[in-house]
Curated annotation (Swiss-Prot):
It is found in: Nucleus; Nucleus speckle. One of its GO terms (cellular component) is spliceosomal snRNP complex. CDD domains: WD40 (cd00200). It comes from Bos taurus (Bovine). Plays a role in pre-mRNA splicing as component of the U4/U6-U5 tri-snRNP complex that is involved in spliceosome assembly, and as component of the precatalytic spliceosome (spliceosome B complex). Gene3D superfamilies: Pre-mRNA processing factor 4 domain (4.10.280.110), YVTN repeat-like/Quinoprotein amine dehydrogenase (2.130.10.10). This is U4/U6 small nuclear ribonucleoprotein Prp4. The modification N6-acetyllysine is found at residue 26. It holds the Pfam family WD40.
Length: 521
């Protein structure tokens, strides 16, 4: 068969104009050394053809390229992108292998443990579950296990922190506890016997007596008003015989006034700053000599001073407090003195032994007020941490935790019936607690501002007195806790209050620098 291969002459046939390819001039390739050419070029440059001016002209013409030295490695950039793509691919692969709970609450808990928002706007359970899966694919499932272990460790540390621990007290503390036990048990028996006798009184007689008392309380009026100092009066307290009233002032002075005519008897000088409280000894003006210690006071600088009735100077100073002492209270026996301090503790002092026998901690913030049970067996404290505590002085244990107030507790008091406790707080309420049931039995919405003090009627506890920063004091029935009378008359905050031992007089002191006596008509 004949070959159809075209001859060489066929390539020389003339093609159409539109198919003619442009002729490309091939560059010349030179072989060998360029030394001679370079010498010629340099020789011409020395003659001025390519000198500095020629170099400058070449740069301006763009024939000579001057670079900054920056180099962009294309291969390195491509490798980084490839690494990112591979990492994302591996992450998605891990995400598909991670098992996530279908319980939405558990998914939220896991997100919270990882420090992520538990929900986003418009996010449903499925999207939330997928978001958790993506987070775990980045941080790893071990992160969730680690957070759970940390939570368990923190719980264990909290449990260890909440364990009871003890201070080793002095031998005098043991002696004092035995003494308090021997003192309180007979008084408790006497109180219970009086309660039995009171219960034997016919119901009609008791009801009529209560009605007469309520009628008398409703007729209370301002009997006397006296300007007590140039600065606000922070505290007032009746003497046991109800013939004197002690007031504490922000000027650092303590004053004694006659009752009921309100004449100034003594001015006690010794404090250099705001006095927080001054209280009479339980046996002062009754069986105690005037030269003995009849009063105790405390101030914001941590000083606690003891006073007699025949001198304007303090008899002794109780040293040991380094920060503010808010309140001071006598034990019913008169042998011990309790102080509350802003160092989150309260202390018990034995004045016969002249030493501190108990430094009790337990509050997480400063302790503001303290009260003793009339038997002498218990102490109640109210703190700025919004909690109250009841302590058994015979064993040192906290027997009741008063939890329920929303703000600081500024006042606490025991009822003469032996089982009711009242607390006043910065949340404007007064709560009544039952020692037998160990719970709050009633919450009184007492005032429109913080409650500064609470006080039970000292004989039978038939009514409750409260004072507050709304410039009023109020009287409440016991046990009904209904309002009986509002004592309005102060132009400033009511900062302190007290009821005389015979129950006939009520005293209130105020930020307006006055104290007032209230008596039934």
């Amino acid at each position: 068969m004949a070959s159809t291969r075209p001859s060489s002459t066929a390539t020389k046939t003339k093609a159409p104009d539109d198919l003619v390819a442009p002729v490309v001039k091939k560059p010349h390739i030179y072989y060998g050394s360029l030394e001679e050419k370079e010498r010629e070029r340099l020789a011409k440059g020395e003659s001025g053809l390519l000198g500095k001016e020629g170099l400058k002209a070449g740069i301006e013409a763009g024939n000579i390229n001057i670079t900054s030295g920056e180099v962009f490695e294309i291969e390195e950039h491509i490798s980084e992108r490839q690494a990112e793509v591979l990492a994302e691919f591996e992450r998605r692969k891990r995400a598909r292998q991670i098992n996530v709970s279908t319980d939405d609450s558990e998914v939220k808990a896991c997100l919270r443990a990882l420090g992520e928002p538990i929900t986003l706007f418009g996010e449903g359970p499925a999207e939330r579950r997928e978001r958790l899966r993506n987070i775990l694919s980045v941080v790893g499932t071990d992160a969730l296990k680690k957070t759970k272990k940390d939570d368990e460790k923190s719980k264990k540390s909290k449990e260890e922190y909440q364990q009871t621990w003890y201070h080793e007290g002095p031998h005098s503390l043991k002696v004092a506890r035995l003494w308090i036990a021997n003192y309180s048990l007979p008084r408790a028996m006497k109180r219970l016997e009086e309660a039995r006798l009171h219960k034997e009184i016919p119901e009609t007689t008791r009801t009529s007596q209560m009605q007469e008392l309520h009628k008398s309380l409703r007729s209370l009026n301002n009997f006397c008003s006296q300007i007590g100092d140039d600065r606000p009066i922070s505290y007032c307290h009746f003497s046991p015989n109800s013939k004197m009233l002690a007031t504490a002032c922000w000027s650092g002075l303590c004053k004694l006034w006659s009752v009921p005519d309100c004449n100034l008897l003594h001015t006690l000088r010794g404090h250099n700053t705001n006095v927080g409280a001054i209280v009479f000894h339980p046996k002062s003006t009754v069986s105690l000599d005037q030269k003995d210690v009849n009063l105790a006071s405390c101030a914001a600088d941590g000083s606690v001073k003891l006073w007699s009735l025949d001198s304007d100077e303090p008899v002794a100073d109780i040293e040991g407090h380094t920060v503010r002492v808010a309140r001071v209270t006598w034990h019913p026996s008169g042998r011990f003195l309790g102080t509350t301090c802003y160092d989150r503790s309260w202390r018990l002092w034995d004045l016969e032994a002249q030493e501190e026998i108990l430094h009790q901690e337990g509050h997480s913030m400063g302790v503001y007020d303290i009260a003793f049970h009339q038997d002498g067996s218990l102490a109640g404290t109210g703190g700025l941490d919004a909690f109250g505590r009841v302590w058994d002085l015979r064993t040192g244990r906290c027997i009741m935790f008063l939890e329920g107030h929303l703000k600081e507790i500024y006042g606490i008091n025991f009822s003469p019936n032996g089982y009711h406790i009242a607390t006043g707080s910065g949340d404007n309420t007064c709560k009544v607690w039952d020692l037998r049931q160990r719970r709050c039995v009633y919450t009184i919405p007492a005032h429109q501002n913080l409650v500064t003090g609470v006080k039970f009627e000292p004989i039978h506890g038939n009514f409750l007195l409260t004072g507050a920063y709304d410039n009023t004091a109020k009287i409440w029935t016991h046990p009904g806790w209904s309002p009986l009378k509002t004592l309005a008359g102060h132009e400033g905050k009511v900062m302190g209050l007290d009821i005389s031992s015979d129950g006939q007089l009520i005293a209130t002191c105020s930020y307006d620098r006055t104290f007032k006596l209230w008596m039934a008509e």
